[in-house]
């Protein structure tokens, strides 16, 4: 495997696949990194029992001349190179241009009982199920916000789960207003109608959210607050996710400027997806949640721009802008109810890695001070779960990224050419 | 239907489809993947490699994310719960 690529793409989801394919079609030598064992990302995650959608199969099969580097996690940033860890060891991969297609993760908000086994994200359970997690005959409650809940419920049902209900926190009026807007997006309307048809018979409730999960060693029942009052459902699994948050850790470590439209940053890019760092581009969710269509278009655009074909990228802009408007429509209509920010009580664990409760974090106004005093954010997830939740809860923003981006082996750290000085990451 | 893979989870034999994750194989046996620092049982949360709640020992290697690891024939998985 070469140690240098003209274009290195991080993330093999729809954006990264399009970027790699486009750059390779222009004759560039392209490497496509992903921490997962197979390309596809989250939305096109491989399903062990069902065939992938045609678009996913096409995107993966089109990768002629691209080195797909699966099971490769980025650990740190070097000079025009990334330090990566793979099962066979660690190495440095240099690049001419770097395309960040790092995607998004689910927003997971703490509530009493959320650490019980059997409580997962909504997209989380969908991903687990596609990879063989046993759900056949299991009673599943799906909750949270956004159309992802419907997609997750659909996958669960196809794998034999008994979906007891879908509990959407957005009120019925705004979900209906969103549905009316779909007439401007015929393809989406058809997709939504198909989902609703397949989910016929599954209750879809609005203005409803999970207050608490109960159980001894695993979730057994959940309390759901609805406009009509509180109800308790017995279940085997609870899948609850509140939308998506861009993965920006690598971009932050590279020094790329961030934009804040709310509590969570996304990578700041110009019309041609250039970040504030020369030669580094960001495509898809990393640049703000926009969905699958945006990811594919921006991936292609970044592949064009990174290889010097800006005219081809410009040609995709009108279509991209239109799809970005759909993303804005989604975030407006599925904005989170303020009550979701006060679900956690004093004893609810916020940092699941270090078992830090909400009341232990009282009085802290920055992540670093909280970390030093309570260990909040010092565990293996490096604050991805608790830091993001605390930012959403309005406590304090997450600290900037510092190496290693993910927990790494000592041998990998020993191989870093530029050892991270703590001073450089202490912040001002 | 895809081929089946046989592996061991805490000594119990498990059979799952090829391409399945170690997390899926464990879930056939137990919902306890690891113990938290205060000794509470934990299991996968995010399903996509972010939360590290699913980390287990795979073929002698500790702290492997079960949700990101594909099963292989004869694999030995040990949970920490």
Regions found by a protein language model. Name each.
Chain A
Residues 2-380, 384-427:
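Residues forming the flavin
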